[in-house]
């Protein structure tokens, strides 16, 4: 099935193995419906979890975008969201709709795969994000892995060769959040997120994010601050074109976000 323009609001693709819960990948590339904590949670967001891309031309200009199309929801906001949020305040910041993104967005899906094709006259590449589930016919065990996989295919449409970086930023959604990094057997860095609940508690959880690119590294913690300081600091660092700083905090902090970068 193919979705574009207004039809993008009608599709959310479930990511996750059989019986493991799921995370929704919306038609415009936004992550939503975080139903991986033993309960339904339609419409939920997990902070500023998102995919992003950047490159730099010979003149030094940096092009940075979130890997999303236009936000397809109401520009007025949602009802019953509390003080400073809701109808009349506009879409929630976590939709990333106010960040540089792509004008053209087309979603195609055929389970267990979906594709989002992104293009913009002001960005020197076309991008296809493919997301898929560990669905293997006649192999229930491996099809039940609590995992989702992504590939990012980049087609340079500019007049000069450029190096591209992609980033996956993931918020730790567990109470007593602890972020860390490890080096995998394939020499790739992995971002590990865990909570503070005991292992035998229904509230216990952990997530891991890694990248198979030739050159990878992690920023285990975004800047901790008030208001919108964490996302603003990250975006300033990302859109500068420079390597993200190696920031680390030793103490637990609910809502910490980390990033894995691949080149």
What kind of region is each of these model predictions?
Residues 1, 8-11, 102-104, 138-141, ...:
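Generic recognition of flexible, low-complexity loop/linker segments
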Residues 1-77:
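Beta-strand-rich N-terminal accessory domains
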Residues 9, 49, 110-112, 146-150, ...:
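Residues that flank catalytic or metal-binding motifs in active/ligand-binding sites
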Residues 10-12, 19-21, 115, 151, ...:
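Beta-sheet entry/capping signal
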Residues 30, 114-118, 157:
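Beta-propeller domains with acidic blade repeats across secreted/periplasmic ectodomains
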Residues 57, 118-122, 156:
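Short acidic, glycine-rich loop/turn motifs
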Residues 76-146, 225-262:
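Extended, loop-rich substrate-binding clefts of extracytoplasmic carbohydrate-active enzymes
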Residues 129, 134-243:
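Polysaccharide-binding surfaces and accessory modules of carbohydrate-active proteins
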